[in-house]
Amino acid sequence: MKIHEITPKDYTDLHRLYCQLEDDWTSDIQDMIRVLEEVKDDPHYHLVGIFDDADKLVGTITLSKCLDLTAKARFYYSLENLVIDENYRQQVYGQALMQYVEDYVRRHNGRYVNLTSSIHRTDAHEFYYRIGFPRNYTVGFKKNVVDD
């Protein structure tokens, strides 16, 4: 298994993974690529993939560097869109990807990681608890400001 940043050659497989993440996810691959191109050179955004021994993309996570002036004026990292291919779940891929993220955050002087997950993804929540995310720590809110 290998973990590294997603490259343009991985975009089709990345789109396939995102289709597994949400049943109603309808983003066109070209829309996804357009957004990725907008942030590709921004050092605060990282799109990381985990690959099996055959170099197939089997999981991904988005990692964003954020500022928290109330936390000893240090940075934290926001984790979004963690998805492991449904045929590779309950193996080591999710845990390995999250360990990579924790190591990355430590190396880059991050104080903590903040993770969001859709409320209905209870299996994912159990995974997060098992790897050390505390229960009932915060409540998150999301408000759409544009009607799609």
What are these regions (language model features)?
Residues 98, 105-117:
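Conserved GNAT acetyl-CoA-binding A-motif
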Residues 39-49:
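A short helix-loop-beta-strand connector motif used in the catalytic cores of GNAT acetyltransferases and
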Residues 68-79, 89, 136:
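A conserved beta-turn-beta hairpin within the catalytic core of GNAT-like acetyltransferases
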Residues 1-14:
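A short beta-loop-alpha structural element at the N-terminal edge
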Residues 49, 56-65, 83:
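Conserved beta-strand in the GNAT
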Residues 84, 90-103, 130:
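Conserved acetyl-CoA-binding loop-helix of GNAT-fold acetyltransferases
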